[in-house]
Every structure is written in structure tokens, then in C-alpha cells.
Amino acid sequence: MDQSNRYADLSLKEEDLIAGQNHILVAYTMEPAAGYGYLEVAAHIAAESSTGTNVEVCTTDDFTKGVDAIVYDIDEANGIMKVAYPFDLFDRNGLDGKTMIVSFLTLAIGNNQGMGDVKNLQMFDFWVPETKLHLFDGPAVDITNMWKMLGRDKDNGGYIAGTIIKPKLGLRPEPFADAAYQFWLGGDFIKNDEPQGNQTFCPMKKVIPLVADAMKRAQDETGETKLFSANITADDHHEMCYRADYILETFGADAPQVAFLVDGYVGGPGMITTARRNYPSQYLHYHRAGHGAITSPSAKRGYTAFVLAKISRLQGASGIHVGTMGYGKMEGDASDKNIAYMIERDECQGPAFYQKWNGMKPTTPIISGGMNALRLPGFFENLGHGNVINTSGGGSYGHIDSPAAGATSLRQSYECWKSGADPIEFAKDHKEFARAFESFPADADKIYPGWREKLGVHK
């Protein structure tokens, strides 16, 4: 059934929809299945994503039609369509009237993913009216809170050198805590790897007290504040809160230095919201494990990594992993820096829409996946700043001297870039950074050809 007469209006102007502040606008790449027209399928998507179905129903009235999602723009040559969703379509909390992210996802990227007349459909951007942003939680704390604890400048506190405890699984409590202590002697921030929690060989109630003690000892030895991101991911919110409460109680006076890591993609929006609303004083660390199933550049359905990051800011994530922008081991390229810009700035141009955040706190880009001291200068140069959290597991524990030396090499890498120094010349006066060349020779050969001769290192 062709529903374009009701669910499409190509005379609508985007600037008018934006000025009206009454719609969420969504941009998709779309390819119809063979034998179907582009506008026909686009209208069917809008219908299925709002008030329609595959037949006319007798219960539809004029009010219902007033909240139809409408296709307002198509670019068939480039396979792009845009839909305006009336804001009133989205479910609201009974408790506080906030708009539910799950409702947005259910409509904008729900049943339309399985329609028979659609070959491919992927959301690549969306726009939220500035006047409606207060209906989303947004972050409660951000990187400025961490900078304050670290004694940094409150507006431009710079790079936070972090790691992931490696190996990701298999360490018992004592070796785990020792690995944390060794890194903290040179670095700032440690996160649980996303599967770490309460395994039988490393029970939470044994390892967390040891990690809290390791933090205290490292702080005493270095005179620096240390940060820990503890995984509270679980199948239900009672278990999440049980873990969170135990962790905060165990860290005691150092509890403000604890972030909560949540596997937000596999766990879903409700898990992020549980952490955000129950623990607004803690840094909310959104890990996106599993997202590549739909956000991979090879995927043609679902939504992009850009969309996931933008959603995370609305949900209230203090920070989210954004890949490595082509400088690490994860999928992505240099243009992914726009993901970071969208979540850290108060306004930014996305692939389709210019989003103003109206003062909503920023979400910090968290960089991880194959990064080390040699790869970071190029990364910083591409991004244009170093106000990120970087968690380098192999880049720390793979350093030829020690995890502390690996952590120090990360810090030195940032200082090298910030000062505008040539990395090889900088290495001559910075031992830990220099030893990173020997620690990661394959990277050194690729990024800094001739480094052996220049640094006097021989095979």
C-alpha cells in the first residue's frame, strides 16, 4: 500500500521544522528492496515508525494523523531520506516527565529494521530541539570533575593517561591489584575491562578491597590523585546498585575518585539510566562493547557510531569510548573526530544536522584499542587537542620496562605533542618515551622510519 499521500510531504522545509522546535529530525541512508519505489518505501518507514501499519484502520482519527511521522526530504540518487517525528510521539516517564531514549529507539530504529520492502536502512544523524533537551538527563559530571580532583586547570586540564587491566580475564585478586598499583605509579586512570566483575576466580569482595588499598598506596607514593572505573554492569538494576554501593563503601574517602563503567550497548539504555539516576555524583563511563554489530562501516542497517555517541550524551554518559580514529586497532578513520566534537562541544555540525546542546554538560571522548605512546602524537594532531581519557592496556603493560614506565611514556607522548616537538628528538631526553620505540618496534618502524639509527638502537 502506497502511503506517501499521508506520510510524506516534500514541501516541508527543514529550517521551518527546526524553527518550530516540535520534532526530532532523523536522517537515514535507505535502499528499497527490488521492485519498490523510493518515496513509497520511505513513507512506509515513516508510517511503521509512528502511527501507521500496512492497511488503513477504522480507529484512526484526525488527532492521530496530527502525530504522524513525515518524510520531508529524499535524495534518491544518494540514498538519503529524512523524517520528522513529532515530539509528542515519544513515551514519557510517569515519575518525572522525562523523555525515554528507549521510546526514541523503538520508533526511529525499531520495526522499520525488519520491513520486507527495505533492503538497507541506517540512521546516520538526528536532531533534537534545543527547547526539549531538558527532557533528557544529560551528564551529571564530566571531565572537569576529574581535572579538579587531579589538580588540573578546570577548563583545559588535558590528557588523562589511563589503562585497562590486562589480561582482560584470568587474573586473581592479588595479581589484579598489583597490576593496578604498578600502573598508578606512573598514570592517572584505570578501568575494569568490560568482562571483569565478579568471576569465581576473582570475586568482587576480594579484589575491590585490594584495589582500593593499591590506590591509597600509589597516592601515598606519588603524591597524586588516582582514578578507578569499576564495572557495575549486570542483568538487573538491583545487582548494579548492590555492586555500586559495595564499591563506594569499600573505597571510603576515595569514593569520589571512582567512576562506574557500564556496558551500555549490550545492557541497553535502562542500564545507563540506572547508573545516571542512582549515582549522579559518579563519573558514568559508557563502554560500547558489541556496538560494531550495527555501527561497523560495513553495516547497512541499525545506526552509526556517531548516532550511538550522540545518544549517550542525551542519556547522561560522562564519557564514552569513541574508537581510535584510525590510529589504533579498531575500525574507523580520521574523520571520526567529528564524533568527539559532537559530544564534547556545545554546538556542532553533524553529518546532516547542526546540533545545539543548550548548555548540556559534555561527554568525554574515551580513546582505547591498540593505542600506545608512539601512536598518540598523530592521534592528538588529528583531533586537535588532548582533552580525552585514553586507556592503553597493551601500551602500558606491554612497555619493555614496566607498567609504570608505560604510563609515563603515555604522559610524555602528550607532552611531546603539546610542545610541538619532533617525537624522535623528544625521545632523546625522555627515557620512558624512548623505550616505547623498543617496546613497540613494528609501530616505530611504520610511524617513525629510521628511528633505530636516530636513537642509536640496534636489532
Swiss-Prot record:
Cofactor, how bound (note): Binds 1 Mg(2+) ion per subunit.
EC numbers for this chain: 4.1.1.39
SUBUNIT field: Homodimer.
Cofactor needs: Mg(2+)
Described function: RuBisCO catalyzes two reactions: the carboxylation of D-ribulose 1,5-bisphosphate, the primary event in carbon dioxide fixation, as well as the oxidative fragmentation of the pentose substrate. Both reactions occur simultaneously and in competition at the same active site.
Positions that bind Mg(2+): 191, 193-194
Reactions listed under catalytic activity: 2 (2R)-3-phosphoglycerate + 2 H(+) = D-ribulose 1,5-bisphosphate + CO2 + H2O; D-ribulose 1,5-bisphosphate + O2 = 2-phosphoglycolate + (2R)-3-phosphoglycerate + 2 H(+)
Single Gene Ontology BP annotation: reductive pentose-phosphate cycle
Residues the record marks as site: Transition state stabilizer: 329
Pfam family, one: RuBisCO_large_N
The protein's name: Ribulose bisphosphate carboxylase
GO terms assigned for molecular function: magnesium ion binding; monooxygenase activity; ribulose-bisphosphate carboxylase activity
Entry keywords, A to Z: Calvin cycle, Carbon dioxide fixation, Lyase, Magnesium, Metal-binding, Monooxygenase, Oxidoreductase
Induction of expression: Induced by growth in high levels of dissolved inorganic carbon and low NH(3) levels (at protein level).
Gene3D superfamilies from the UniProt entry: Ribulose bisphosphate carboxylase, large subunit, C-terminal domain, RuBisCO large subunit, N-terminal domain
N6-carboxylysine modifications at: 191
Gene: cbbM
Extra remark: The basic functional RuBisCO is composed of a large chain homodimer in a 'head-to-tail' conformation. In contrast to form I RuBisCO, the form II RuBisCO are composed solely of large subunits.
Active site: 166 (proton acceptor), 287 (proton acceptor)
Organism placement in taxonomy: Bacteria, Pseudomonadati, Pseudomonadota, Gammaproteobacteria, Thiotrichales
Family from the record: Belongs to the RuBisCO large chain family. Type II subfamily.
